């Protein structure tokens, strides 16, 4: 087994606490509403949203795969940090054991925030992670972030 690390950052004009509430804490409800072209629904399979919770994320028809199951590993309300692992479905299977993800939302001096994202692809055997896979994951994250950001800009009273 190998581990391939990928890190990226994305900035937003939304304050860190507000982004954490909307994108992380209420993302299961908000994201399918604001980005149905990317995620059709999220089902809570087990747990209360904290560590150990299992969620099934369903994708719309025509998407490369039907679903993924995520396991919540950590929710840090003080430091706006969220860790989860993709444990089933989607790219996980013959070549990947899991994908561990960490999202940390940090306030910026201008009142916005930066999302620091770390992805660890745990491969099976000697398999390597393809650049297209990383690119698709980054594009999906950017799509979801911008959809949430647009919603928050249009609804200034939400998630304060």
Swiss-Prot record:
InterPro entries listed in its UniProt record? Bet_v_I/MLP (IPR000916), Bet_v_I_allergen (IPR024949), Plant_def-hormone_signal (IPR050279), START-like_dom_sf (IPR023393)
Q: What does this protein do?
A: May be a general steroid carrier protein.
An individual GO BP term: defense response
Its family? Belongs to the BetVI family.
Whichever gene encodes this chain, its name is: BETV1L
Name the GO cellular-component terms.
cytoplasm; nucleus
Q: What is said about its interaction partners and assembly?
A: Interacts with brassinosteroids such as brassinolide and 24-epicastasterone.
Record-linked Pfam families: Bet_v_1
Q: Which SMART domains match?
A: Bet_v_1 (SM01037)
Give the species this sequence originates from: Betula pendula
Binding of brassinolide, residues: 55, 82, 84, 101
Protein name as annotated: Major pollen allergen Bet v 1-L
Keywords assigned = Allergen, Cytoplasm, Pathogenesis-related protein, Plant defense
- Any idea which GO molecular function terms this record carries? abscisic acid binding; protein phosphatase inhibitor activity; signaling receptor activity
Tell me the compartments it is located in: Cytoplasm
């Amino acid at each position: 087994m190998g581990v391939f690390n990928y890190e990226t950052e994305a900035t937003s004009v939304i304050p860190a606490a507000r982004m954490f509430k909307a994108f992380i804490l209420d993302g299961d409800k908000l994201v399918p509403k604001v980005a149905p072209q990317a995620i059709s629904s999220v089902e809570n399979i087990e747990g209360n949203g904290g560590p150990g919770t299992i969620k099934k994320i369903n994708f719309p028809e025509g998407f490369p795969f039907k679903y993924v199951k995520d396991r919540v590993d950590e929710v840090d309300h003080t430091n706006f940090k969220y860790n989860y692992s993709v444990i089933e479905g989607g790219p996980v299977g013959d070549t990947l054991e899991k994908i561990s993800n960490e999202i940390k939302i940090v306030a910026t001096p201008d009142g916005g925030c930066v999302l620091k994202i770390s992805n660890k692809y745990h491969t099976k055997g000697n398999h390597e992670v393809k650049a297209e896979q990383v690119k698709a994951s980054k594009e999906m994250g950017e799509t979801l972030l911008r959809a949430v950001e647009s919603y928050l800009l249009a609804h200034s009273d939400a998630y304060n």
